[in-house]
Amino acid sequence: MCLVAFLAIAPAGWHTLQMKCSSQSEFPRIRRPLADLPQLLELGDPARSRSVPDDAACFALWDKYDMLPNIRRHSFLVAHIAATLAARAVASGFDVNVSEVRAGGLLHDIAKTYCVRHGGSHAQVGAAWAVAETGNYAVAQGVMMHVWWPWDLPAGRGICALPFFVMYADKRVRHDACVSLEERYDDLLGRYGHSEAAREGICAAFRQGKNIESALSEQLGWTLNEDSFDCGRLVS
């Protein structure tokens, strides 16, 4: 089932889809356990002293945790997009650690292979591994939150932070190709939307992704949905 069919809307283009998925009346508010916890500290504060794993260190962790080749390709593109966003933020006057954002992208799916084989939340397991292996809590936060942000999105400049760069980048990469959010979530619905609850969760994540996209576009002065981030050159 495609995302358009699930939403029962006429094939009037993705703009209609965006408006439909933005309607809070269509789906109940998705409740996740983390939403009942206090919001995390601002772990992305560049003033905090911590080491940042470079590419070689991240690739070594890929090997250590036996990351599948397709997940490596996906993670490499996510890191590229996230770092591109972070570099644009720095150029726009934001205090962002680009290397740290890149590390968050490279490691966001570090536990995906393990959880595919053995079960569990790859975001939660991966965040625990990221803390244990790097001691960098900001990178671990990016790993932990790359699937779903359980609190209200920060207003204004607060959106330009590591978790949202990694989260948005992940939402723009289907396997090893940069695609629109609409294409990404149409694929997710086809593969995982086998129940009403699953379909509601996918659509909620799509809406959140569009909200992040709009907020980042506004802060960075960049029409993100029209940009492919030169990803084609990385996988050609």
Where are these regions (language model features)?
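Divalent metal-dependent phosphate-bond-processing catalytic cores, especially two-metal-ion Mg2+/Mn2+ enzymes
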Residues: 6-9, 13-49, 64-94, 107, ...
